[in-house]
Design a protein with these regions (language model features):
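Cytosolic catalytic domains that perform sulfur/thiol-centered chemistry
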Residues: 1-172
Length: 172
């Protein structure tokens, strides 16, 4: 993620869990959006996942080297594009905990056999700005803000330019 000023691929090349495949959240997000890490188009997702060699019935464990921010976003991408939720997991504690527990890591990058992944977007999982605006006026669903308490309360600046601080009305 850009605001961390880290290079995920460089970190992956240095050490990762054996047989792990690198997923670049920045590169694999919508390019023509002013908002960060928006979902790509279906055909783009199919190309991304096919190049990773992942098949529709593969069980997937996702981890990252942060506070699970990237892995949760990656997890949601797979769920949104129709991968069976029972087959998608986030590694508890991520790479940090894995290493703290003195588990094996490697710098070997395996050769990937390209697959032919077919996505089935679950569009009902995403709400747009219009839905949120309507919910502010007439509450129909819960809105949960997963940012830090300080960001939710507007006590600290947003890490990305152009985003206002504070919460959306009717959010928790």
């Amino acid at each position: 993620m850009p605001q961390t000023k880290r290079n995920g691929f460089a970190e992956y090349k240095t050490q990762h869990i054996q047989n792990a495949i690198f997923f670049d959240l920045d590169k694999n997000s919508k390019k023509d959006s002013s908002l960060p890490h928006m979902l790509v188009e279906v055909d783009d997702w199919e190309k991304i996942v096919s190049k990773m060699g992942i098949k529709k019935n593969d069980e997937i464990v996702i981890y990252d080297n942060s506070d699970v921010i990237s892995s949760c976003r990656c997890w949601f991408n797979f769920i949104f594009f129709g991968h069976d939720p029972k087959l998608i997991h986030v590694l508890n504690g991520g790479l940090k905990k894995w290493i703290e527990e003195k588990r094996k890591v490697t710098n070997i990058i395996n050769k990937i056999e390209v697959s032919n992944y077919k996505a089935h977007p679950q569009k009902k999982l995403v709400k747009n700005k219009i839905s949120i605006d309507q919910n502010i006026e007439e509450k129909r669903f819960e809105v949960i803000d997963a940012r830090s308490k300080e960001r939710f309360e507007g006590k600290v600046s947003e890490p990305r330019k152009g985003l206002r601080s504070g919460s959306i009305k009717n959010s928790y």
